Amino acid sequence: SNSLSSGQVLHCPYEPQKAKLVVREMTDLLVLDLVDKGLVADQMVLTVGYDIENLTDPARRAKYHGAVEKDPYGREIPKQAHGSINLDGHTSSTRKIMCAVSELFDRIVDKNLLVRRMYVVANHVLPEADAPKKNDGAVQLDLFTDYAAEEEKQKAEAAALERERKIQKAALAIKKKYGKNAILKAMNLEEGAT
C-alpha cells in the first residue's frame, strides 16, 4: 500500500492547542499535495511525539501517570500518541480530511503534555482514476426514507466537492506561479503557526 506523509519537529515544545494548529496546517498542505499529484486516500494516520520537559518538570511529571519510552538519546519521554482514522471512501477533500485529522488529534493526544514532533500520513493512496467508486448499484428500499431528499442531498454533496476541487486547483495554480506563500489562510497567521 502507498502513502504520502508530512512530518515536523518543532523548535520548542508546544501546548496541545497550538500543536493541533500545526497539524491542521500540515494536513492542509498534504491534501494540496494529493490534489497536485492526482491522488486520493482513504485513511489518515497521526503520530504525535511528546517533549522531554513533560518528565523533567516536577509539576508536569506529577500529573503524568502514563507509559514512558526512551528517545533516540536515551532520555525518558512520555510514550508517543499514534492512531488512524478511516475516511468515507477515497478522497482528496480538504474538508473531509481536515475534520478526520482534527477528530483523530482530539482522540489520541494527551491534553496535559507538551508536543515536540508530529507526523501526518495519508494512507492507501491511489491515483484518482483507480479509486473505487461508491456503489451506485442495488439499494435496499424501505417505506420510511424520502429517496428524493436523499438524492438531492447526494447531488448537493457532489456539487460541494466539485466546488472544493476547483478551489484547490486554483490555489495550486496560484502557489506554483507566485510561490508557496502567495495564499495564506487565517490559521497560518495565528500565534504558533508554522
Residue spans for each PLM region:
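Basic, low-complexity intrinsically disordered segments
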Residues: S1-T194
